[in-house]
Amino acid sequence: MVALDCDAQRALELAEMLKGKATWVKVGMTLYYAHGPSIVHAMKERGFKVFLDLKFYDIPHQIEGASYSAASKGADMLTMHTSGGVEMMKAAQRGAVRAAEEFGYDVPATLGITVLTSMNDSTLAEIGVSRGMADQVKLLAELAQTAGISGVVASPQEASALRELLGPD
């Protein structure tokens, strides 16, 4: 997967160079907010699968709509913050499924962000979370599993503990 953390012109240049050599591109907030759905369309047009990493976080109704919109543009993978809760994650899944059915796409993978990799025990405490990093990640990953989303994003240090807790998939 190639992260397109650059401007649109450079992203399109990279896409041309990577055609046939890479399958996935990641479109993050900066590129998407600057250029909107057209950047997803441009990558799909060039044959790439698109990981749309917008880290949704809002009330369930808004997230269902955001997920529907992203999936309707052809995103193959979406992200959301698991700290939004089970209902928010279920809403994201509903929106993605509904768009896929309406537009004839495969249902995009829905991934939950547990704790941002820039955070640590101190920043968790700063926002009122009394659990340590490892325990918070486990709790949020369990919520993601309960919600039925496709998986979670976590640091490599947490991967084995999460597999043990949640299973190999």
What annotation goes with each model-predicted range?
Residues M17-K26, K73:
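Catalytic domains of carbohydrate-active enzymes, especially glycoside hydrolases
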Residues Q62-A66, A71-S150, S155-S160, L165-D169:
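Conserved anion-binding
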Residues K19, K44, G104:
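Anion (oxyanion) recognition and catalysis
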Residues M1-K21, V97:
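N-terminal glycine-rich anion-binding loop in soluble enzyme alpha/beta folds
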